[in-house]
């Protein structure tokens, strides 16, 4: 007899990569702003975040942030409200795409998205790692990350030591430019 899982249980297959990939696909659907804030940026933010993650960081929230923080952008340059729009749109996904998150994880994700363009740091290790994961990818638009503006110790280290950042990510400075 076949048994089908319904509700939150269907997401408890420990296949986080599959769930993250569904979010990535959702974010890419209809994306029209090109690569500056598109999939390649999101993938680097995810990679950067995992590099920055300490034991205190919720890596699931960090990975989801990578693919959702820019989803509701309306342009690539003058859109300081996109984080707020992301936080306002995420509740619509709570019962579907993000139904497997705990309330704490969902709230962390909303806060990280909302504040990532307007806040330097929060003191929360997960949210601050999200901020720095995004900031370390400023290189793609010719902006060198400022160690003084990073929210985490690791983020500040990598911003001050870009050679080590490139070595640890297996990249070079030329891999980032658009």
Task: Tell me the role of every PLM-derived stretch.
Residues 27-31, 70-76, 94-98, 117:
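Short amphipathic alpha-helical interaction patches enriched in hydrophobic/aromatic residues
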Residues 4-7, 11-18, 28-57, 68, ...:
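Divalent metal-dependent phosphate-bond-processing catalytic cores, especially two-metal-ion Mg2+/Mn2+ enzymes
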Residues 45-50, 81-96:
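An active-site-proximal "capping" alpha-helix that borders the catalytic cofactor pocket
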Residues 59-78, 82-86, 110-117, 134:
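His-Asp-centered metal-binding catalytic motifs of divalent-metal-dependent phosphohydrolases/nucleases
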